[in-house]
UniProtKB/Swiss-Prot annotation:
It comes from the Bacteria. It comes from Vibrio parahaemolyticus serotype O3:K6 (strain RIMD 2210633). PANTHER family: UPF0260 PROTEIN YCGN (PTHR37421:SF1). NCBIfam families: PRK05170.1-5, PRK05170.2-1, PRK05170.2-5. Belongs to the UPF0260 family. This is UPF0260 protein VP2169.
Length: 146
């Protein structure tokens, strides 16, 4: 049995198809982030991009996501050193940090169902910008809250 590509290739040497397949489709990168102006610390919120389908955790207009007017960030090989802002479960970040993929990752399990069952996606856990009054009330990783 051959070694899976994510264990045998660096991110820089993956094909476009391999690169795209690393995304588990959790939807976490589609959550709005807030940055502390004093510390530059990034805080994730449960506020989703308006293009995110909260049931499927996928973009409603994936082919046009970079031109839709939303602030969708394209992950590229040139940005690997900056992947620390990505969720700690993100395959791009994990591989950039020489860490293994989680056991629920679709490349390991063959489907997204294990990821959803493990609670690692944003499925049915988000609100949309239009419903937000105070963004700070939606911070998920607030340092002063349990």
């Amino acid at each position: 049995m051959s070694t899976p590509f994510w264990q045998s290739k660096s991110l820089e040497h993956m094909s476009e198809e391999e690169w795209e397949s690393l995304c588990d489709g959790c939807g976490k990168c589609c959550l709005h982030k807030l940055m502390d102006e004093d510390t530059d610390e990034i805080y994730y919120t449960n506020v989703a991009c308006s293009w995110l389908n909260s049931k499927t955790c996928s973009c409603k207009d994936y082919p046009n996501r970079f031109t839709s007017g939303e602030e969708c960030t394209k992950l590229t090989r040139e940005d690997i050193d900056d992947f620390t802002w990505l969720p700690h479960t993100c395959a791009y970040r994990l591989l950039a940090e020489n860490q293994p993929l989680p056991e629920w990752h679709p490349l390991i399990t063959g489907s997204k169902s294990a990821m959803h069952a493990a609670g690692e996606s944003v499925r049915n856990k988000v609100v949309y910008e239009i419903d937000v009054v105070d963004w700070e009330d939606h911070i998920l990783n607030h340092p002063n809250r349990p």
